[in-house]
Amino acid sequence: MELDLSPSHLSSSPEDVCPTPGTPPETPPPPDNPPPGDVKRSQPLPIPSSRKLREEEFQATSLPSIPNPFPELCSPPSQKPILGGSSGARGLLPRDSSRLCVVKVYSEDGACRSVEVAAGATARHVCEMLVQRAHALSDENWGLVECHPYLALERGLEDHESVVEVQEAWPVGGDSRFIFRKNFAKYELFKSPPHTLFPEKMVSSCLDTPTGISHEDLIQNFLNAGSFPEIQGFLQLRGSGRGSGRKLWKRFFCFLRRSGLYYSTKGTSKDPRHLQYVADINESNVYVVTQGRKLYGIPTDFGFCVKPNKLRNGHKGLHIFCSEDEQSRTCWLSAFRLFKYGVQLYKNYQQAQSRHLRLSYLGSPPLRSVSDNTLVAMDFSGHAGRVIENPQEALSAATEEAQAWRKKTNHRLSLPTPCSGLSLSAAIHRTQPWFHGRISREESQRLIGQQGLVDGVFLVRESQRNPQGFVLSLCHLQKVKHYLILPSEDEGCLYFSMDDGQTRFTDLLQLVEFHQLNRGILPCLLRHCCARVAL
């Protein structure tokens, strides 16, 4: 083997190459050290790493090429080796998790704000960013709503969903958008009694398996253990009329199972021969239809839609259903969410609860009304204070205290005019988030419905029939009821009442604060104010 290690810049002489005269060609040179005067010291020589020996070059050209049986183990020098398993299993971040994306979010008044988020940002993270920017109170009810105005569809994003992934599935150039608003019904299935969301007649296990277990225990097992019963009931399904080209509505008996959504072609039969498959739960999303009568001709106001994920635009492929009432629709929507996400929904609820408790423990208490559920009426007229237990006495004490406070405030801050106190008391409600000004009855019902038909959601608006009156719109049992508030004047003082003057309040703020603690003539307490937040 010959190694040519001589650099080009070194000179060689014939004496260095030829052997000494008289020495046989086969004889190697003597090992004795040369004389000191003829010593030649070696120099370090650079050897390229890609240099091949002549024998290797010859073998490489003479042997046939053999395919590599493990191509996944080899990679170009400029790339890192490919490791098996997903990035989540290895504890590493996804390759594009640091990629920044722009997400546009709209408020209920139509204002838009662009937010720069990471590619893996969840809906909960985006809501927290918007709450901080809007200087709003942070709670578990904030959410993002995926809205498709062209299709009249909308749904609330779950807290764990990726906002960027949802946005990338939208059609290019469409009018789809995210809306930032409160959704009080998001976790109501873990708060309210089970029979309010899942009626006994709609849970198949209660009717088919007489095991002795109560309906409430069955629903608790459904929510806690992840055992999925069958949801069933009559729904109207939109179909095409033969030869007419019109969309007709027909009533079918439907079943929601873990495997998908079905309807029976023969009455209430559950025979597999009579079941027609509609949609896969894991490959679809359920939406609320907002303008069903106008766009789809829905016979009632309680429509919902099952939209396959692969469907990007157009009405073709949408499965439009119509229920008889709001309770039935809420049951189908809640069951669909539970079947699709399972225990992840309960984890989201627990995380939201822990975040709320942590913020209330670490930070300052949120700004709220003077009235609070922890306050009680006290009487300090004697030598020692006592708790007022009589409701009528407590009401009179609260009214007297509120009037005294307002007299002090008006005397200190207002101008010395006789009607200044009256004007301040009459306009104090305009600064409250629950006051929506002059909106119609239908608009108030729409706003409350968008933020969740939960008991205690309310707003106050100006009356359109009575120029001097107001209306309290309140949700109870998934229905919005309206209560007229009329003003009255007694001895130069203005009062407001909902019961023909039997219970009078100096302003609307006092009326709302009182009914947050006492039902009065209302069917439930005022729990959640329907408010709009500007981004």
Curated annotation (Swiss-Prot):
Subunit structure: Homodimer. Interacts (via SH2 domain) with EGFR, ERBB2, ERBB3 (when phosphorylated), ERBB4 (when phosphorylated), EPHB1, INSR, FGFR1, PDGFRA (tyrosine phosphorylated) and PDGFRB (tyrosine phosphorylated). Interacts with SHC1. Interacts with RND1. Interacts (when tyrosine phosphorylated) with FHL2 and HAX1. Interacts (via SH2 domain) with RET and PTK2/FAK1. Interacts (when not phosphorylated) with ELAVL1. In stressed cells, but not in normal cells, part of a complex that contains at least GRB7, PTK2/FAK1, STAU1, ELAVL1 and TIA1. Interacts (via SH2 domain) with KIT (phosphorylated).
Highest rank taxon of the organism: Eukaryota
The protein's name: Growth factor receptor-bound protein 7
Modification Phosphotyrosine occurs at: Y187, Y341
Entry-annotated residues carrying Phosphoserine: S364
Intrachain disulfide bonds: none
Pfam families: BPS, PH, RA_2, SH2
GO cellular component, one term: cell projection
Reported impact of R461K: Reduces interaction with INSR
Biased segments, Low complexity type: 1-20
Site (Important for dimerization and for HRAS activation): F514
SH2 domain location: 434-530
Biased composition (Pro residues): 21-37
Keyword Cytoplasm among record annotations: yes
Domain PH: 228-341
One Gene Ontology term from the biological process aspect of the record: positive regulation of cell migration
Entry's localization field: Cytoplasm; Cell projection; Cell junction, Focal adhesion; Cell membrane
Site (described: Important for lipid binding and for stimulation of cell migration): R238
SUPFAM superfamilies: PH domain-like, SH2 domain, Ubiquitin-like
Domain comment (free text): The PH domain mediates interaction with membranes containing phosphoinositides.
Entry-linked SMART domains: PH (SM00233), RA (SM00314), SH2 (SM00252)
Keyword terms, alphabetized: Cell junction, Cell membrane, Cell projection, Cytoplasm, Lipid-binding, Membrane, Phosphoprotein, Repressor, RNA-binding, SH2 domain
Region feature Disordered, mapped onto this chain: 1-89
The record's account of how the chain is modified after translation: Phosphorylated on serine and threonine residues in response to activation of receptor kinases. Phosphorylated on tyrosine residues by TEK/TIE2. Phosphorylated on tyrosine residues by PTK2/FAK1, and possibly also other kinases. Phosphorylation is enhanced by activation of receptor kinases by a cognate ligand. Tyrosine phosphorylation is essential for activation of down-stream protein kinases. Phosphorylation decreases affinity for target mRNA molecules.
GO molecular function (one): identical protein binding
Its job: Adapter protein that interacts with the cytoplasmic domain of numerous receptor kinases and modulates down-stream signaling. Promotes activation of down-stream protein kinases, including STAT3, AKT1, MAPK1 and/or MAPK3. Promotes activation of HRAS. Plays a role in signal transduction in response to EGF. Plays a role in the regulation of cell proliferation and cell migration. Plays a role in the assembly and stability of RNA stress granules. Binds to the 5'UTR of target mRNA molecules and represses translation of target mRNA species, when not phosphorylated.
